[in-house]
Amino acid sequence: MGLSHKERREYGRSYKRDNNRTAPFSCWPRWIRPGGWSGHGGMSGTTRTGVTARLAFWGGWLSPCLSRAGEKPSCVRTSTRTQIITCCSRLTCSGLPGARAGWLSGLCWRGSGVLLLDGHFAAADEAVNRKLNRRAGAQPATGEMTDVRQPAFRGAGTVNALARFFHGRGPETAGVFLGKDEQGEPVLVPRDTWRKTNIQILGLPGSGKSVMATNALIRSVRDFGDAVVYFDQRGPVAALLPAHCPNFTLLDLRPGKPAQLNLFRDLDQYALKNLLVAGFNLSETGHVADHYRISEQKAAKLIAEQVSAGGKHSAGAGGGVRAAGGPEKGREGADHQAGERGRPERPADGQRHRRGGDNQRRRLLYVIGSMDDEAVIRVQKMLFARCAQIIIARDEFRRWPHASIMLDEIKYLLSKYVLNALGTVRSRDCNLRLAHHAGRLRAAGQDLPADFVKTTVLDNTPIRWFYRAASQESRSGAGQTGEIRVDVERRGPAGRRGTWSISAGTASSRRSRPLFDVNTLQHLLTGSR
């Protein structure tokens, strides 16, 4: 084999560590002199290095035993493929028949041993030598990491998510079904964790994140009696929800639809001012542009005072700006925004809904918004701010039904109310479910720094629900799942020259890596999380 004494010793230690037992004698290479017994024969002056159980058995064990029995073999010729034993008589016989009888019995003993045991030892030799050849083969300089996980992805298969939502006893009644993982196994979130934790859902368009989130929310309403407010920008599941949620309310904010909601009904001036600040992005950012925002905030305050006093909010918008004494740019911006918002905010008679009644047990409010109409986007922001106001106004010493607020495509709903609600509504038995692409958090509102938005969302969403990602920025979310320690082995250039293996040495170290790397997220099948 050409292995050095150090390599043979290292192999023995690794064999004992991996198999929890010492290596068998066939695994211990040793210097064997096949002709070393007598010094005669053509192989008496040669030495060989190899892992050969037959050499160790016949040369190291059997021959001394036969020598003690009275036989003195002179030469044993051995090869690595076959074993040919030739015994030459060097007996100093004095004509005694017993000496020759002992020699013949020893020869018969050796012959029967070759026939019966040689095949077994040959198979053991081949297995051990094959393993050693793989270890001593040529290997380029590389870095390898070991990990306990085996990311062997299976087919997603067909999953009837609603079929898993059954009534009765069993493990499924105590958890919320989210889908299947990369191994094809169901993922269940315990009920206690579901009602105490905000969840962030990330994935490509069409990966199934909205569908599975809808299934989870249906179960929350139907089986657990939760109240759900669902903000959706497209409305693809509006026809599915009434069949599973009897207390279903649809609020369509798309352009061309009749007014269905009065956001300003029964509001005091402070709550109304906060709605205007959230809808028009009037929060201070710390930049020089805050000079104009302060004037616009004064205008929003005056509008709120006039509305609470009985004036019309649409007519009082311009007067409020002028009364605030703001600069010309501030007056123009507020007049334009108030004009854009005047029509959708005015409800039609007989179609008004009071938002406070929607937070009852087993109710689902489904809001269809828009991703391109600025007026509708502002209404969405103010509607969520109103939901947060209702939740925060709950009596903390009273038991309320759990509420879940689903924000699909959070980019079009981002405001300071959303970020503050991640931490404030949890104390009122309410949690948020945020669905978006990883890069969409950077496209926040003009009053929200992108880094501040990203940090706040990550810190307040312990559960991250990942689907298949394509872009590098989306795959970077894998680093948010925590890290594990792995072993890194670096080997120098290695090669083989004849029967000798040459190696420059190895170095082992430990390093950290994400629990789920980018390859895991990129190769998830459709329907897996």
Curated annotation (Swiss-Prot):
S-S bonds: none
Ranges of compositional bias, category Basic and acidic residues: 328-356
The entry's keywords: Conjugation, Mobility protein, Plasmid
Region (Disordered): 311-356
Record InterPro entries: Mobilization_MobA, P-loop_NTPase
Described function: This protein is essential to promote the specific transfer of the plasmid in the presence of conjugative plasmids.
Name listed for the protein in its UniProt record: Mobilization protein A
Source species: Escherichia coli
